[in-house]
Amino acid sequence: MRLESVAKFHSPKSPMMSDSPRATASDSLSGTDVMAAMGMAQSQAGFGMAAFCGKHELSQNDKQKAINYLMQFAHKVSGKYRGVAKLEGNTKAKVLQVLATFAYADYCRSAATPGARCRDCHGTGRAVDIAKTEQWGRVVEKECGRCKGVGYSRMPASAAYRAVTMLIPNLTQPTWSRTVKPLYDALVVQCHKEESIADNILSTVTR
């Protein structure tokens, strides 16, 4: 079973899981099986499970748990980022909370997010390659140039920058870009990494 099946399981129309075989191909995972598998995955990949469940609106509690996990990670690696490492006590903690909150919000975006769907590909991540279509006489697609194939626009990092300047008024855009934004980007990437870890663990325990 993959993580995407967890979201389907929580849908009222999906009381049984049939996409992942157990002993035989005809077996289905019952609700008890799914809950047990999720419990095992959460014990081994709490961050990734919380991130995914919060992303899919399965639990408001998981959203906050994911942000807390992300803040812990941010504290752990903040020494590598000069713009954050030099901050003191309470200010540093608040900045890391802002970065974690905005980074998680960026991770949660999808083509279904209101206003986020790519205008060029309409959420498909694909666009017509006009030159090759004319050359070959048939429709040839390519990765959408606007959204880079994901189907939606990312949350502007400028939103996080504006929030951070409420705590560090003298933080200039160039300094943000060089010394703080790299941490923000790393937090977004970490969310995706943790989701991937959770997905692999869930797949393993339901194999």
Q: Where in the sequence are the language-model features?
A:
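N-terminal alpha-helical interaction blocks
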Residues: M1-C108
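Intrinsically disordered, low-complexity regions
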Residues: L3-V6, W136, V150, I168
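Short, flexible, mixed-charge glycine/proline-rich loop motifs
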Residues: T101-R117, G123-G125, E134-V139
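N-terminal low-complexity, intrinsically disordered patches enriched in charged
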Residues: K132-E134, A160
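Long, charge-rich boundary regions
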Residues: K148-R207
